[in-house]
């Protein structure tokens, strides 16, 4: 399935049903009073967070959503039914903004969370509402109100516990495929991963956490170079970052410093998140490899997703940090 993380849609509440102008007409009641029913309220439009959805792809094909109109009132004081609401499912982690000014409307993060985005119009009042001592036979009924209309922007920010960060070919996709059921494309060239991937990592017998693999960062990602800026937002919500650097990197310390710079430039508190440095591909580490140390005292783990070296220790470390972050 194609991954789409932004969309713009038009939503409109249903118009209210018209009130009815009617008079009681029965045998032996030649001058019955007004008996027009009220119109029904128009349907509302809601967004609902759905944990089964992982992309905004559907909104590339359908961009207009309108709730049902309220039913008109009838004679004999029969009120019209309310219009049916329209409920639009969106992935958990969807940010909703007003397209006109970019203002934040809501951030839907919890399964089943609902947001009213367009109210239906009020039902019009039937002519009995307009009767008075001086006007006992009003020949007027109120039309239904117009439903609210709004253009909204949807932006998906993935929900994960651990975010994998690294330059292209650092081994992120291989790691997530080795510890979860996720099967991202893997190859020995840069930018194999073109979209984010989520994997559920089983820990011990009854626990698990969610890991997110995003396309590799390059120098200047925070300024929009490469794929970095587009996808760095998907690790904003993560509790812990795992920074991956390949053991055969020419300069591990310099690569780590570069990754930190990009996270700092992007902002959103990425650099303040707890992180673990993973030296990957230890199965092909050079003979003169030495364990690096970093000035920020970030814990360093040596792993190989191919041989399984260090994977259990990695799971222990990540689980401990995820739990400590709540």
Curated annotation (Swiss-Prot):
Write the Enzyme Commission number(s) for this entry: 3.6.5.-
Alphabetically, which GO biological process terms does the record hold? ribosome biogenesis
EC main class here is hydrolase
Q: Which residues form a coiled coil?
A: none
Provide the primary localization: cytoplasm
Quote the cellular component terms of the Gene Ontology held in the record. cytoplasm
Location of the region described as Disordered in the Swiss-Prot/TrEMBL record: 119-138
Q: Where in the cell is it found?
A: Cytoplasm
PROSITE patterns, alphabetized? G_OBG, GTP1_OBG, OBG
Question: InterPro entries under this entry?
Answer: G_OBG, GTP-bd, GTP-bd_Obg/CgtA, GTP1-OBG_CS, GTP1_OBG_dom, GTP1_OBG_dom_sf, OBG_GTPase, P-loop_NTPase
Which keywords does this chain's UniProt record carry?
A: Cytoplasm, GTP-binding, Hydrolase, Magnesium, Metal-binding, Nucleotide-binding
| Superkingdom of source | Bacteria
* Domain Obg per the UniProt entry, residue ranges: 1-159
Explain the purpose of this protein: An essential GTPase which binds GTP, GDP and possibly (p)ppGpp with moderate affinity, with high nucleotide exchange rates and a fairly low GTP hydrolysis rate. Plays a role in control of the cell cycle, stress response, ribosome biogenesis and in those bacteria that undergo differentiation, in morphogenesis control.
Listed under subunit, the entry gives: Monomer.
Family membership, please give it.
Answer: Belongs to the TRAFAC class OBG-HflX-like GTPase superfamily. OBG GTPase family.
The name this protein carries in UniProt is GTPase Obg
Q: Which organism is it from?
A: Chlorobium phaeobacteroides (strain BS1)
Kindly list the organism's lineage: Bacteria, Pseudomonadati, Chlorobiota, Chlorobiia, Chlorobiales
